[in-house]
Amino acid sequence: MGKEKTHINIVVIGHVDSGKSTTTGHLIYKCGGIDKRTIEKFEKEAAEMGKGSFKYAWVLDKLKAERERGITIDIALWKFETSKYYVTIIDAPGHRDFIKNMITGTSQADCAVLIVAGGVGEFEAGISKNGQTREHALLAFTLGVKQLIVGVNKMDSTEPPYSQARFEEITKEVSAYIKKIGYNPASVAFVPISGWHGDNMLEASSNMGWFKGWKIERKEGNASGTTLLDALDAILPPSRPTDKPLRLPLQDVYKIGGIGTVPVGRVETGVLKPGMVVTFAPANVTTEVKSVEMHHESLTEATPGDNVGFNVKNVSVKDIRRGNVAGDSKNDPPMEAANFNAQVIILNHPGQISQGYAPVLDCHTAHIACKFAELKEKIDRRSGKKLEDNPKALKSGDAAIVEMVPGKPMCVESFSTYPPLGRFAVRDMRQTVAVGVIKSVEKKIGGAGKVTKSAQKAAKTK
């Protein structure tokens, strides 16, 4: 895939039976990275298993199964093309880990696509108090996904089919509740679709002659169109943070015979180049980058969004690990956090959270227990206004400013300076009990860490 078109990331959200998989599968299938051979293979398997009707969801089920088995699956399969963008689907929720993934997010979504089912009774179930639709939309907004598209799906199974009244009723209700969350409905495209039959997915549907298209208004420029694909094309392109200092959270560290130590991760901000001297925090190790590779090709530079492996000199696999963060030793190098203040929203905790609570935090690739050292203030979830000082406890639905202290060395940043390193999920009892964004970090001023010989040499020659 060349660099001609801009790459954007979307996350597809919505209730479990809204038809997310079918809709996503349809897009990947029709405009996507699935080659003919793979499709023929899937179709043959589907037929053999009596799924001969070949639902698009089958594509996605296959991909999910492969992804969950840890097969390094051709990431192109999760991509598709519009006339303007290469689109990558970051995660199709449905796994239990979706919320965690969305936060630790292999990346930040540029836009969320909310799929709601239009069928009789289905929409109501998804949006009810315990439906997932609300929670997903609230999460997307809290985590900084400011663009939204709503697909009103299963229009073929409304009563009567392709009902304009039903579409308008749902649009009105969804508008009201996304507005409560913080989205501006005027800037959100509402598209009536059938992910299964293909209505208004790539081409205007002949079944909904009443639909005159969607229109959105926003300060960056208005847009209009008919299909879901048009709406994806109207997403505002992201500004990628190449001008910020380097931050690269490590996903793994490999030892490769004849090459040495190779940390692997995704550049979140800044640029990584061979010859740079990088510091790993909280390990406090500084060394020179010998080479940078992506998909087995060496790069002269890696920019935000690139998943890369890079070879470092004189560092053993024991020195650095997943969850460490690499940065430029000469430009705001990353440091260990002594403590940090965060704004948290409690999602689903059966009891109460009080001072001293120490669950596991998932922040970028780090997975570390942190203590709620002080509950500073309880705030209004939407406006951020203070409701009370030093609350005794927090329960589901509450938002608060808290001071957190990591139980082990950890590197995090404030959301405003390095967004991907400033949002986290609080995990306990095998579920996400809260999400948070980091307001400020107190850095631990460490002594001199390990500086390898090659780093010293590189510093001298510069």
UniProtKB/Swiss-Prot annotation:
Keywords, A to Z, come to: Cytoplasm, Elongation factor, GTP-binding, Hydrolase, Methylation, Nucleotide-binding, Phosphoprotein, Protein biosynthesis
What is the top-level taxon of the source organism? Eukaryota
Q: What top-level class of enzyme does the UniProt entry assign?
A: hydrolase
Q: Which GO terms describe its cellular component?
A: cytoplasm
Q: Name one GO molecular function term.
A: GTPase activity
Residues bearing PTM N,N,N-trimethylglycine: 2
Residue ranges of domain tr-type G in the record = 5-242
Instruction: Please name the CDD domains in this protein's record.
Output: EF1_alpha (cd01883), EF1_alpha_II (cd03693), EF1_alpha_III (cd03705)
Residue ranges of the region described as G3: 91-94
| Principal location class | cytoplasm
Any one Gene Ontology BP term: translational elongation
Where is the region G4? 153-156
Q: Where in the cell does this protein reside?
A: Cytoplasm
Q: Which family does it belong to?
A: Belongs to the TRAFAC class translation factor GTPase superfamily. Classic translation factor GTPase family. EF-Tu/EF-1A subfamily.
Q: What does this protein do?
A: Translation elongation factor that catalyzes the GTP-dependent binding of aminoacyl-tRNA (aa-tRNA) to the A-site of ribosomes during the elongation phase of protein synthesis. Base pairing between the mRNA codon and the aa-tRNA anticodon promotes GTP hydrolysis, releasing the aa-tRNA from EEF1A1 and allowing its accommodation into the ribosome. The growing protein chain is subsequently transferred from the P-site peptidyl tRNA to the A-site aa-tRNA, extending it by one amino acid through ribosome-catalyzed peptide bond formation.
Q: What is this protein called?
A: Elongation factor 1-alpha
Species for this entry: Danio rerio
